[in-house]
Amino acid sequence: MPITQNYGTGRRKSSTARVFLRKGSGNISVNGRPLDEFFGRETARMIVRQPLELTKNVSNFDILITATGGGTTGQAGAIRLGIARALVEYDTSLKPELRKAGFMTRDAREVERKKVGLHKARRATQFSKR
């Protein structure tokens, strides 16, 4: 019997996450490590679990995740979007609920580039009247 799995891709800032959803008991592994070991911060773990908690599927799936690029927050956001997309692939009736909660929307905010003649993207040198 082939393993049936659902797939979802998520991106946030410079992070990308590939999410594979399989029927199981609620094990979540990111890059071969358990979720609690991969993310040190509790907030990041909460972000990842949000779509599962909303749809009451916390212990119904085993999730395999490959996350690359960016930092902790970016990867957590990318994983959340990937899980939401994989859940919709599994059951399309979950889409309105996930969309209403904002989990189906790609956060388009990116880092603004540094401009020539400025310290940072917008930070200029202190203005001197005289």
Swiss-Prot record:
A Pfam short name: Ribosomal_S9
InterPro entries, alphabetized: Ribosomal_Su5_D2-typ_SF, Ribosomal_uS9, Ribosomal_uS9_bac/plastid, Ribosomal_uS9_CS, Ribsml_uS5_D2-typ_fold_subgr
Gene Ontology process terms (BP): translation
One cellular component (GO) term of this entry: cytosolic small ribosomal subunit
UniProt keywords, alphabetically: Ribonucleoprotein, Ribosomal protein
Listed PROSITE patterns: RIBOSOMAL_S9
GO MF term (any one): structural constituent of ribosome
Record-linked HAMAP family: Ribosomal_uS9_B
Similarity comment text for this entry: Belongs to the universal ribosomal protein uS9 family.
Protein name stated in the entry: Small ribosomal subunit protein uS9
